Amino acid sequence: MAASTASHRPIKGILKNKSSTTSSVVSTAEQPGKSVDEELSKKSQKWDEMSILATYHPADKDYGLMKIDEPSTPYHSMVADDEDALSDSETTEALTPDILARKLTAAAAESLEPKYRVREQESSGDEDSDLSPEEREKKRQFEMKRKLHYNEGLNIKLARQLISKDLNDEEEDEEMSETAAGESMNMEESSQGSATSDQLQNKSQSS
């Protein structure tokens, strides 16, 4: 009898049958006590965000960053001439084209070179006065050589000129050799042509 019941019972597979899923849906619909929210809560997960933050992002964690205890960049105050320009810009008067044009011409009339560079040049002039005449000459020659060495634009132009000159010379040599070869071929053809014409004349006279 055990063998007969085993043969009548279907073999269960791993996958769910369509009939079993539809029967479970029908059974859940028949149970009025369960709400839709309970069904959704079974299918979805709830995250405890506060415990995640406490675990992975604690308040005392520094993430490998460190604070820099350096002073901020020093501030250079403006020169007295620039303070007037600043006070003009702080006024609330409306800018007309005439006022703007006057301010632009006044700014253009001032030195175009920044004031810090003027100070830098003055300090370099002091260094030159401390040097002996021989050292000054060496320094001047060194600066000239450095300018020539780092003048890459000029070097590129010179290299291009030399290359183009070499190419032109090669083309001229090729043309001259071709014309010389062509002339020699023409001379040979003309000499052969004159020889054959002489032979034809001799034959015609002898006959």
UniProtKB/Swiss-Prot annotation:
Family indicated by similarity: Belongs to the protein phosphatase inhibitor 2 family.
Positions where Phosphoserine occurs in the chain: 44, 87, 89, 123-124, 129, 132
Modification after translation (UniProt): Phosphorylation on Ser-44 by ATM activates PP1 by dissociating the PP1-PPP1R2 complex. Phosphorylation on Thr-73 by GSK3 activates PP1 by dissociating the PP1-PPP1R2 complex.
Descriptive protein name: Protein phosphatase inhibitor 2
Domain of life: Eukaryota
Phosphothreonine, modified sites: 73, 92, 96
Composition-biased stretches (Basic and acidic residues): 35-44, 112-122, 133-145
Location of the region described as Disordered in the Swiss-Prot/TrEMBL record: 1-44, 65-97, 110-146, 165-207
BP term (GO), one: intracellular signal transduction
Plastid found in the keyword field: no
Name of the gene: PPP1R2
